[in-house]
Regions:
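Phosphate-handling substructures
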Residues: 69-121
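Short beta-strand scaffold positions
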Residues: 54-55, 114, 135-136
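Catalytic metal-binding/acid-base residues of hydrolase active sites
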Residues: 12, 58, 81-82, 139
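Active-site-adjacent alpha-helix immediately C-terminal to a catalytic or transition-state-stabilizing loop
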Residues: 2, 61, 120-149
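Alpha-helical elements of Rossmann-like donor-binding domains used by nucleotide-donor carbohydrate transfer enzymes
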Residues: 39, 62, 66, 111, ...
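Active-site-proximal alpha-helix that buttresses catalytic centers in soluble enzyme cores
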Residues: 3, 8-74, 100, 104
Length: 149
């Protein structure tokens, strides 16, 4: 049997709601984000999940913990699933960045896609034949999909 990988994004955070670029900051789920995680947990409670893997950032770990609970699973964390590092844009109000020149310290797309590939290889090697739920972030999840497909 092949390894099956399901991707989920963390619930909404305080910074998401305030349009702040989080990047690799920890982030705190807001009430809406907690509700989103609980709703997804309810929807997925009867699905067969063998492993829950999350980014090691708090917002993903907190979401993954809620999703793992009905399955009696512990959350495995990895920095490979961290969000893109936005460098000098981190912590800034997103609408104000529209006309800004991108700083040199933003994680390159090449590095982001490389991390995504490393994550896929890690999952296949570590959890062969398992159903893996991975809780990441918007951009890294898209990178995983781009590399996987």
């Amino acid at each position: 049997m092949d390894t099956i990988l399901y991707l989920a994004r963390h619930g909404e955070t305080v910074d998401n709601a305030n349009q702040i670029m989080q990047g690799q900051t920890q982030g705190e789920l807001n009430e809406n984000g907690l509700r989103q995680a609980r709703e997804l947990s309810e929807q997925w409670k009867n699905r067969e999940i063998d492993v829950v893997v999350a980014s090691d950032l708090k917002r993903s770990v907190d979401t993954a913990t809620i999703l793992a609970a009905p399955h009696g699973l512990e959350v495995v964390t990895t920095p490979l699933l961290r969000e893109r590092d936005w460098g000098g844009f981190t912590g800034r109000y997103i609408p104000s960045l529209k006309n800004e020149v991108w700083p040199d310290d933003i994680e390159s797309l090449e590095n982001l896609l490389s991390r995504a590939g490393e994550f896929i290889a890690y999952v296949k090697k570590t959890y062969p034949g398992k159903k893996v739920l991975a809780v990441g972030h918007g951009i890294i999840n898209k990178a995983v999909q781009a590399v996987y497909l």
